[in-house]
């Protein structure tokens, strides 16, 4: 493997294009395409952009040549899994596994898609995202909206097997809908998705916490 850091010209081009991209994001994309509209619209447009660009191979090649930086010092191994670098995207942003092709080509070391659930889930009523400018942060209450693990996991498998260097994992959650029942139902809900994910991604990850109906709602649903 030839590393970008070991090739003077490739390294110089990578640095210049990265600086250009950073400038363009700060002064053009961020003020005119993200913060001039609601967070929900900005998120949807970003996903749509990834869905379109992933089908343009010359553009993906160009992204990889310009933005993907490789250096042996960035490589790491965690619990037997090799990563090209430690920079990645955690679960929550790419719920339906639409972004791996683009992220792989711009140099991400890993992505966790989802969270996904055993059944398709509409999530909470919109808006899902609320900016908190005084804290430079955002409040999120999507409520596990996703197309369901029967759809998302095959996409993750395809992305993982075709990725050039990025590791792809899947976050598994309990379905957040009116069918949510008791503890046994919840365990089986997880198991359905875990069985679907077995051997089809680098790893399957249950989230440490998730939005779901309250315990009282669950008991009421189970009694119906």
Give the location of each predicted region.
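N-terminal amphipathic alpha-helix/helix-capping segment at the start of soluble metabolic enzymes
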Residues: 3-23, 61-88, 153-165
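An N-cap/entry alpha-helix motif that binds or orients negatively charged groups
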Residues: 15-76, 137-140, 145, 149-150
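Conserved, mostly hydrophobic/aromatic
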Residues: 38, 89, 111, 152
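Acidic/polar N-terminal loop/beta-strand segments that form early-domain functional surfaces
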Residues: 79, 86, 90-94, 114-116
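Conserved alpha/beta-domain cores
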Residues: 83, 91-94, 104, 143-162, ...
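A short acidic, amphipathic alpha-helical/loop segment
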Residues: 99-106
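Short acidic/polar active-site loop segments enriched in Thr and Asp
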Residues: 109, 114, 202
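A gly/proline- and charged-residue-enriched helix-loop-helix capping module
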Residues: 114-166
